[in-house]
A protein has these predicted regions:
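Membrane-anchoring hydrophobic helices of lipid-metabolizing enzymes
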Residues: 1-122, 154-158, 163-165
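Non-catalytic C-terminal accessory region of glycerolipid acyltransferases
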Residues: 2, 63-69, 112-114, 137-140, ...
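Active-site metal-coordination segments of metallo-dependent hydrolases
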Residues: 48-49, 147-151, 211-215
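Short, flexible loop segments at the rims of nucleotide/cofactor-binding pockets, characterized by
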Residues: 89-98, 146, 165-171, 207-209, ...
Length: 312
């Protein structure tokens, strides 16, 4: 009975979110911005987390905290548009072109016999849901996701991300195997590199000067497959005009320190579009943050920061 009840609630929620996805993007952004600010005003915990993260980065101002709250609301509600809008509508909207070119390059390499695959790393910046969705319109992509605890939200997430060309897989052993298989076929995989991994799946590396437990999965996948690695940001444009996709090849090893340094560079370009209310400095069960001493950090597996070249 409980399973049937969960299924019914999930079905209603999916239909509701699909209905939201039919609304114009400018309207969704306007509503999302208002809801994001309302949540910021009503939730002391949300305000505290946002302010603390901004202060850690040395970027705090009331104006930036307020605008980032609006951006977080837009990111949440625009997912309905990205997930459930017809493919043709997304192709008509600005922002898919860079992903289309990237997918075409991958297909061309496959046709030439180069099956090393592509690892796309998309931090919690702007409309990060749009990257895989746009890529999947041209070529297949397998994306890793962390399953929400609530089964209703889990069903919604899977329904939303299971769109044309996109295969979502859970962040567990089976999901990692699926990523490896996709890369060995010469296909693309998508990962949120600033998502806090479980103990044993990451290393400590500085993020805005503070140790953050950072996943080593991109590094392991790249070492096993020789795949091309790129970092992507999907910037939200004003007034609901669409998105601007920025793709950078990540030369060398995608180790945690390099990843965090490159993500920092991206965030500083448009800090209001980073999800500052995300608990990036969460300490996984069984882990202890390293002492602020370089020798102790190295002994504990904390990688010192790597500062990228000027201009990223």
């Amino acid at each position: 009975m409980e399973i049937d009840h969960t299924c019914r609630i999930s079905a209603v929620l999916v239909r509701t979110v699909k209905g939201l996805g039919r609304l114009p993007l400018p309207l969704l952004h306007a509503v999302g911005g208002c809801l994001g600010r309302l949540a910021y005003v009503c939730s002391a915990g949300l305000r505290r987390k946002t302010r603390n993260n901004l202060k850690t980065a040395g970027l705090y101002s009331r104006r930036l905290a307020w605008s980032s709250a609006a951006a977080a609301g837009k990111a949440a509600i625009e997912s309905a548009y990205v997930w459930f809008r017809p493919d043709a509508d997304l192709l008509a909207r600005r922002g898919h072109e860079a992903m289309t070119r990237l997918a075409q390059e991958t297909l061309a390499r496959q046709a030439a016999g180069d099956n090393r695959g592509l690892i796309i790393l998309t931090p919690h910046i702007g409309c990060f849901e749009m990257g895989a969705r746009a890529y999947g319109l041209t070529a297949p992509i397998t994306v890793l996701y962390k399953a929400p605890r609530h089964p209703v939200m889990h069903r919604l997430l899977r329904a939303g991300r299971s769109q044309t060309g996109v295969t979502p897989v859970p962040a567990d052993t089976s999901g990692v195997r699926a990523l490896l298989r996709a890369l060995k076929r010469g296909e693309a995989v998508g990962i949120l590199p600033d998502q806090v991994p479980s103990a044993g799946d990451g290393l400590w590396a500085d993020f805005f000067g503070r140790p953050a437990f950072t996943m080593t999965l991109p590094l392991r996948l790249a070492q096993k497959t020789g795949a091309r690695v790129c970092l992507m940001a999907v910037w939200r444009q004003a007034d609901g005009r669409g998105w601007e996709v920025e793709v950078e090849d990540l030369e060398g090893s995608p180790d945690p320190a390099t990843l965090n340094a490159r993500i920092e560079t991206l965030v500083r370009r448009r800090p209001e579009q980073y999800v500052w209310n995300y608990n990036r400095y969460k300490v996984p069960a069984g882990m202890t943050p390293p002492a602020r001493n370089p020798e102790v950090n190295m002994a504990m597996g904390c990688i010192p920061p790597v500062h990228p070249e000027s201009g990223g």
